């Protein structure tokens, strides 16, 4: 089963006129991984896509917050030293915030009910994550140690 099968499909997405709406999906990592890229997608009422991680030890981290613009259809690639490292059991949360009000300059008509659909005037959202899974916990832990050492070295060097 792919991670795409784990997230809600938002078939019940419904945004009332002149309002905002928030939808959230979660996925629990069944093995350690790192995120090397992400690509969000929403339509005209999309405002933000927020990707967060809740780690098994209870720590929380903001992975990315995309200030959405429908004309932006590109991927974000992480450099090696900042790729999020996710241990097994990490909960990934993707929050999508929609703005169907006059405050949204992309919104063609805030007086419309908005439903899930493929047309630009409908709404949808998905987030594609480029993930590399580790089959070996030791390899993952070694990368975590190397990253920690690199960060300590950068701090000591003043950067």
What are these regions (language model features)?
Residues 1-140, 147-159:
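His-enriched metal-coordination microenvironments in redox/metal-binding proteins
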């Amino acid at each position: 089963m792919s991670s795409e099968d784990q997230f809600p499909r938002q078939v019940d997405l419904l945004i009332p006129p002149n309002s905002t709406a928030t939808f959230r999906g979660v996925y629990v990592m069944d093995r350690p991984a790192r995120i090397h890229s992400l690509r969000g997608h929403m339509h005209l009422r999309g405002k933000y896509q927020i990707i967060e991680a809740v780690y098994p030890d209870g720590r929380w981290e903001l992975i990315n917050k995309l200030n959405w613009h429908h004309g932006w259809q590109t991927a974000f690639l992480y450099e090696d030293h900042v790729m999020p490292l996710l241990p097994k059991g990490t909960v990934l949360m993707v929050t999508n915030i929609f703005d169907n009000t006059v405050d949204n300059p992309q919104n063609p008509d805030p007086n419309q009910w908005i439903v899930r659909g493929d047309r630009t005037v409908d709404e949808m959202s998905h987030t594609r994550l480029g993930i590399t899974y580790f089959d070996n916990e030791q390899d993952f832990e070694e990368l975590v140690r190397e990253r920690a050492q690199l960060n300590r070295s950068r701090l000591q060097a003043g950067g």
